[in-house]
């Protein structure tokens, strides 16, 4: 995942009224990438996707999706 690409997607989404979040798009991108990477590691070490699924649902909710 390219962080610069994600920042531009977040900026466009916010400007278009599709995404809703506080703070800088660059910080939001770091939050998203870190959350997904951590969730993937936890899912792998715990033998299931439940933690990853929960994290992705939360991320979507955090951005109003």
Where do the language-model regions lie?
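Generic detection of well-ordered alpha-helical segments
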Residues: 4-8, 30, 34, 57, ...
